[in-house]
């Protein structure tokens, strides 16, 4: 009798169009992210149903800066972080927090436009055309130990300069950096896409350089909190959906600049970032097709942060990265 009732129930659900993988049958995961073009795989996976098809109900939690996402992941307020690799994240892991960096979410890469250093219209009119021209001037970042702080320090070193040669100004959030630049309250800031294109197109600032052309760098990653690392089936399911989303982005937008699927991705990014598609199309960031992490770069980051007093102790990349989830998901999906 019980089997008959179960069979009738399942048939009834099918007949009225309710999928058997409806929300009560999914694993809910909270993912913390910024509303940036480099979050495209997350947008794609949500809107195209890749996560649901792998048994994951994804709940996005939006932030205005990267470091608070690391904190939220460490405390268990979110399950997945999708943002920049910061000193705050590394310190959390160094202090015993069980966070695992597992996949790529965006690289600074030659020929691709993710992060730019911009100068105010006043500075541009005054003739600023090189980083050396900003000696003694204010450069806005989100927070001390942020990805922007790392980028600035490395770019200055390439010019034979140091962080002591400029005035580093923590402004708290990306939106604050944008607004401060547009209003000419600061000489220079870093911004990510699609804000870079929108600011330049709107006359609010001028691009001094694209970071990827000067500093190949694993700027952002997917990382798992402790609860998710202990729930391996859910962790693998998330990763499979994420890799599928990376492939869709790579095949239909990053390496293809026309057609319905290309426009679809621009529309998805526009929907979630609230920026216009024409600005987004000007510069799509590089993300590996399989979401593969540039592991050798993490050690370089750890060494730099420690050298500059932003890490509490010297650390190894092996303490940070766990590729086992990515490798297993990739094996199940096939290349």
Segments from the language model and where they lie:
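Conserved C-terminal helix/tail region of periplasmic/extracytoplasmic solute-binding proteins
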Residues: 299-335
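Bacterial N-terminal signal peptides that target proteins for export
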Residues: 1-10
């Amino acid at each position: 009798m019980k089997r008959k009732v179960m069979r009738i129930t399942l048939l009834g659900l099918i007949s009225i169009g309710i999928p058997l993988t409806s929300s009560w049958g999914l694993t809910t995961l909270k993912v913390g992210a910024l509303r940036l073009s480099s979050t495209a795989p997350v947008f794609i996976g949500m809107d195209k149903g890749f996560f649901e098809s792998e048994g994951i109900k994804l709940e996005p939690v939006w932030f205005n800066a990267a470091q608070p996402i690391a904190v939220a992941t460490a405390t268990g307020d979110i399950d997945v972080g999708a943002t920049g690799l910061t000193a705050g994240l590394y310190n959390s892991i160094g202090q015993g927090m069980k966070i695992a960096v597992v996949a790529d979410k965006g690289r600074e890469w030659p020929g691709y436009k993710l992060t730019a250093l911009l100068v105010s219209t006043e500075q541009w009119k005054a003739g600023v055309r090189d980083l050396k021209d900003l000696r003694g001037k204010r450069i806005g970042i989100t927070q001390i130990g942020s990805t922007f702080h790392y980028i600035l320090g490395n770019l200055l070193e390439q010019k034979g300069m140091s962080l002591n040669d400029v005035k580093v100004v923590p402004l708290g959030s990306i939106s604050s950096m944008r607004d401060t630049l547009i209003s000419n309250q600061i000489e220079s800031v870093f911004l990510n896409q699609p804000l870079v294109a929108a600011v330049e197109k709107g006359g609010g600032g001028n691009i001094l350089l694209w970071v990827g052309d000067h500093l190949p760098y694993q700027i952002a990653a997917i990382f798992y909190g402790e609860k998710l690392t202990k729930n391996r089936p859910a962790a693998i399911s998330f990763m499979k959906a994420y890799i599928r989303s990376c492939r869709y982005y790579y095949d239909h937008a990053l390496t293809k600049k026309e057609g319905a699927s290309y426009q679809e991705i621009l529309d998805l990014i526009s929907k979630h970032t609230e920026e216009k598609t024409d600005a987004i199309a000007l510069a799509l960031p590089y993300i590996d097709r399989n979401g593969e992490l540039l592991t050798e770069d993490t050690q370089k980051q750890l060494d730099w942060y420690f050298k500059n007093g932003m890490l509490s102790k010297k650390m190894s990349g092996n303490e940070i990265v766990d590729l086992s989830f990515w490798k297993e998901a990739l094996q199940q999906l096939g290349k």
